């Protein structure tokens, strides 16, 4: 009887050890697979200068692209930049079309239910942008007006929730700025940083409304990865923190933005 019980205990322990090992191995799978492939597939819209856009050589470049490439290099792999519409970018991640989303994505409770975030890797503020000569002076003046937003981003959700705005969604900032200048929209809602950088290059005259109490006045943006990958998340977080500490992040930020936006 004792021998039988001992045998059962040994068998149970073996099963437990095997299960623990299998779980640990499964959790490490994505990081291990990534390293085995030698490639980190990084998704972004490619329509969001200066964070991601296509240059004259048909290469996707910008702050997000450079951050993705730097993280990949420190992981010991090469970055493969994949462009995809922002409104379907999380679905593509969950479908394993790429490994990470470096696309200026605001960290929200709703998104955290679907993905894990590395970061924040920068902070930004919600801006209401109008033409310099617009009669719109405050948030309340937008009542009944047409506002432009990026399809699928947090600002689109905010604008639609106001209930008093006509919301027009776009694939990216360049189209919005063209329509703002032409009067096809009265304002646009998005992160302040890319707007200021874009108009500095184009010379377009705009004004940002003073909205100190607006929801989302300062938001954190993160790098999205699939859930249940603790090793990958920890490794990428460590890489990002090292970049923030050793000057690599600041160098990238100064190149594309002109300031440190951490």
Regions found by a protein language model. Give the residues of each.
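Sec/Tat signal peptide C-region and signal peptidase I cleavage site
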Residues: 21-28
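Extracytoplasmic small-molecule ligand-binding "clamshell" domains
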Residues: 29-104
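Alpha-to-beta junction loops
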Residues: 40-41, 76-78, 95-103, 146, ...
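Ligand-binding cleft/hinge of the Venus flytrap
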Residues: 52-56, 68-77, 139, 152-171, ...
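Short helix-initiation/N-cap motifs at beta->coil->alpha
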Residues: 65, 81-91, 134, 153, ...
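Extended ligand-binding regions for polar small-molecule ligands
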Residues: 66-74, 146, 151-153, 218-259
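Periplasmic-binding protein-like
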Residues: 123-130, 192, 196, 200-241, ...
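Flexible hinge/capping segments at coil-to-helix
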Residues: 130-147
